[in-house]
Amino acid sequence: MQEARATTKYQRVSPYKVRLVIDQIRGMQVESAMNLLAFSKKRVAGVVRQTLKSAVANAEENLGLDVDTLVVSQAYVDQGPSMKRFKPRARGRATRILKRTSHITVAVCPQVD
C-alpha cells in the first residue's frame, strides 16, 4: 500500500500536548481532520495541520494519489531533545526546568474499501 508521510522536528511544545491533538485525527478522512484542526483551540493544532498538509502534498506530488480518498493512517509524536533551564527559588536555591521538544509524524494513504 502506498503511503506518504511528513515529519516536523524540534517543535517547541511538549509531546503530551501534541498527543492530545494527534489522537483525535488518527484514522480520519483528511478533509475532516483538516476541519477539526482548523477550528481547534489548541495552539499546537496549527503545527499538526501544517504537517498534515505537507503529507497530503507529498502524496499528491510524489505518488500521484487522489486527495479526496486519503485517510490519516499514522499519526504519532516522539520526544525530541529537552533544553535545560533554571528557575530561581526561595533561599538562594534553583530548580531545573525542562523545555521539551517534539517530533511530529503524520502519514496518509488511500482509503481501502
UniProtKB/Swiss-Prot annotation:
The gene is rplV. The lineage of its organism: Bacteria, Pseudomonadati, Pseudomonadota, Alphaproteobacteria, Magnetococcales. Disulfide bonds: none annotated. Part of the 50S ribosomal subunit. One of its GO terms (biological process) is translation. Belongs to the universal ribosomal protein uL22 family. The keyword Amino-acid biosynthesis does not apply. It comes from the Bacteria. SUPFAM superfamilies: Ribosomal protein L22. Keywords: Ribonucleoprotein, Ribosomal protein, RNA-binding, rRNA-binding. GO terms for molecular function: rRNA binding; structural constituent of ribosome. This is Large ribosomal subunit protein uL22. It comes from Magnetococcus marinus (strain ATCC BAA-1437 / JCM 17883 / MC-1). It holds the Pfam family Ribosomal_L22.
